[in-house]
Every structure is written in structure tokens, then in C-alpha cells.
Amino acid sequence: KKLNPYDYVIDGFHKANDTPWKDYKFTEKELVWLSEIARKNTLILDVFARPYALLDLKTTTNFDGVIMSYQNSKVSQELSAQLIFGARSAKGKLPVSLGSRFPIHTQIKTQALGRLTYGTPESVGLSTVKLKKIDSIVTTGLH
């Protein structure tokens, strides 16, 4: 009921990745929740675990998107958020076969919408050195 007022729901499936032997499966409760959310809302599922977790999904019929982010790390989460909101393009391919719904090399390519991304100043034509000088001047002015 709490999600009813929302048009879009982004569900991040996070599992610890400190060891490759850690359990990566969805619980039965999580599968029921996903099914119910997808039935009533626009759902994007972002999996921060091994791709084999997708084998637990009985259906993705009502899912509007599935993103395979692989690692549960700060960098993966930041890049994934940029992808979802259009700052980065999607171009990866699923490296393993996960049955008929997700055969090997499954992919959906998207184009970046030209929004601001996380990155270095040089990636958008700016200079780190000059920005540090500006930062120093502003800091001095504030004190």
C-alpha cells in the first residue's frame, strides 16, 4: 500500500559480495514482494549480485526493466543510478545463459540523455587544476 502513490519503483537487490560463495538467492518473501510490486507499479529491478540470482524469478512479465549490476559496491550503485536516470548508456551483455528468458549475451542498449554524470572534470572538458584554484579562492572568501 505504501507504494501505491508512486508511478515508478526501483528495487535494488543487494547481496554481500565479500566472497563468491555467499548466498545470492532471492528469498520466497522477496519473490512475492517483487511480483506484487510489478503487478501494481512500473518496476525496475537492479540486481547487485551474481547473474544466477535471476534464475529464482518465476516471471519478469510485469517488470519494466532488469539491470544486472553484478557487484554490491558503491561504484556499482553510483553507475547504476546514472544508467537508470539516463546519464550513462547501457551497453553490457549478459555473460551467461539463464534459461530461455535470459539467453547468453542478452542486452538492451540505451543512449545517454546527456545528463550530468559522476566523473572527472576532464571528462567534460574542464581542468582539475583550475577547479582546485577556484575552490581555494571560494574557501578563502568564505573564511
List the model feature ranges, each with a label:
Residues K1-G125, V129:
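C-terminal non-catalytic regions of proteins with extracellular/luminal or membrane-system context
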Residues E122-H143:
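Beta-lactamase-like hydrolase cores
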